[in-house]
Amino acid sequence: MHSSIIKLKGMITNRFVLLTISFLIPIISFSQSKSELDIFKHTAIDTTQLTVSYELTFKYDITGAENPRQDKVYTYIGHRICHSFVESERSTDLNMAAQYQETGSRGSRAAMLLASNVGEIYTNYPKGKFTVIYNMDGAGSYLYEETTPKMPWKISTEHKTVLGYNCTAATCKYRGREYKAWFTTDIPLSYGPWKFAGLPGLIMEVKTQDGDYHWIATGIEKPKEVKPIYFLDRTYVKTTREKTRKQEHLLLKDPAAYLESYGIEFTVISFSGETVKLKLFTFENPIEKE
């Protein structure tokens, strides 16, 4: 496998590490003139009724988590299928896939080790199931299907306004985390960001009890023309949820060892010139704990 060198320079204190990452491998960037649909074969699986944008705030560091990060999430709600993804995760994943298609080298998304890593979700595709896609760096993009679980929501009498919509609160426990969601019956579509669904209205906000993950709607748009929901027909490692979680654990627990196992060489250097072990950085805070 083609090796690449990644240099990470950072200021080390007893509380955090500030990283500046520079890649020595070429990355193909999508532009207006060359989109993902120009690069990959694709299949239209539904048409979009509504596009909802969310701001995701998350804590990636289980050791301290004083500095939460933010990203954009987009949810395309179709007539049968819902497609939700984190903007930076999907962009990086597709850049790597495009690079692999053109050069035979996967490269690395080391810069994305601080990403939310919640995956790309197709709900009800195939019918009654999730299709979940995770980028696993040197191991490629993992894809698995699972039966759509019913989230045991309990609707309360709490109300508040989100993005101008009157919302009702609901809570549930799901795969090791407790969630509180706010949904609006003004938009009777039973979806939201990530895998969230099953309430009698659009989910406008969701937050974990511990505050590690927080989604809030920032925009709602109804397409003025036909806007297909696409599934990209590219190379995936078809696997199971159990194997994906095991791979994710290895990646987040010790990024250095994980990247080295796929032939990706790198150095980590502090401002004082010392070589630092990447294992010092703990990123393991997966969205699903069980």
Task: State where each predicted segment sits.
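Bacterial Sec-dependent N-terminal signal peptides
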Residues: M1-K41
